[in-house]
Each structure stands twice: as C-alpha cells, then as structure tokens.
Amino acid sequence: MQAYISISFSKRKELEKEVQAIKNALQKCGVSGFVFVDEYQFSAKQEKKMMQKAMEDVEKSAILIAEVSEKGIGIGIEVGYAKAKNIPVIYVRNSKSEHSTTVSGIADFRVIYENEIDLEEKLEKILKTLSVSFKPHQTRTN
C-alpha cells in the first residue's frame, strides 16, 4: 500500500527532513511513501504526460499527504484529484508557515507541526486511526 506525498517541486530539497519524517511515520504503519517529484523528471513540453502520470500515481495510492509548508499549484491539483477519487487527504504544514485555506478546507485530517519529530508523532497517530479503514483504492472501469 502506498501514500502519495505531495510537495512543492521547487522547494523539495528544503523539505528533506519533513519528507523523511512523513516516510518514517508511514513505514511504522506498513505504508510506503511515494514522492512524485523524486520519481520522475519531465521537460516543459511534457506537461500532459506529467499530469497524466501524476493522476495515475494518485489513483494507485490509499491516501495523499499534502506537505504545504511551501505552497505549490501542483499540490492543489493533486489534492483536488485525490478528493474527486475519494482518496483521504492529510494536510501537513509547519506552524510557522502560511495557512493554505484551499488545501486545509478540502483535507480530511490536519497536522500542524513544530519540527520533524513532532510531525512524525502527530502523523503516526492519524495513520493509526486510519489503518482500520485502509483499503487499496480501486479504479473504476466502465
């Protein structure tokens, strides 16, 4: 089972500790973390291919974790797509970062953290409550 970790492409390196904390919490709950921006590289001319692949990977995920300490348009698109597919969304941000009303407003759970240790602990608690209802997402076919 996988969790899609949605983060800002341009700020990925700055969020390394946070991404590792998210992956640690997921691992403790038997879920693998998938970071789209770490897995693929697309040229500017490949925008359709990029978005198609992102949607496919969101659909393969049991949950989506949106790290919005650094905002990004792509995060909002991925969150909206996950919600449209009935995939639970967890909103995650550092307490010192600006609040994202759109992502928070659509999220099923929220984690506001002080540091990566706090993030890992809070996220793990939410994941444990979700573990009872974790089911691999099934894509509908016509």
Language-model segments: which ranges?
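Conserved catalytic or regulatory cores that recognize and/or transform ribose-phosphate-containing ligands
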Residues: 1-142
